Amino acid sequence: MPRFPLSLLSALLAAGLLAACASPNEDKTAGWSTDKIYAEARDELNGGAYDKAVPLLEKLEGRAAGTPLAQQAQLEKAYAQYKGGEKAQAVATLDRFMKLHPASPAFDYALYLKGLVNFNENLGLFSWLSRQDLSERDQKAAKDSFESFRELATRFPESRYTPDARLRMTYIINSLAQ
């Protein structure tokens, strides 16, 4: 069995330790205020860079924990996930928001967004191109959407989101009845 010189072994060990201590992913937001993080996240959202907005909103949620800004970050993260095509993550984020903040003034929006995520789950590009209607697709998402819209209309009849939710409920009922 070959013997390695002690100096070579020491050099390899030192290089390994240095590599382990290196931080390849420095946090560019380390010195930022919550307002700056929020502004950057909004810029990414407005520019359609949803994949860049999500990590910023996650950082904001952690740094502003327990504040209305953290709640706003959760909702905007769900929106970014939805628009970025991460629908399952958006629903999970909204479910978490609703569990943690049942008395939030934005609870109606959370229900509406959850309804939209599931509603549009059935309206993908393939379905549109094939002219396939809602009654021919998996109906679980439609039922979940209907339930979110129904809860919104029942609990928040005066919400600004309720009229659109009712229209979408009618569409779902008519589509499933075909």
Roles of regions detected by a PLM:
Residues 6-13:
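Sec-dependent N-terminal signal peptides
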Residues 2-5, 17-178:
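Acidic, polar-rich low-complexity tracts and alpha-helical solenoid repeat scaffolds
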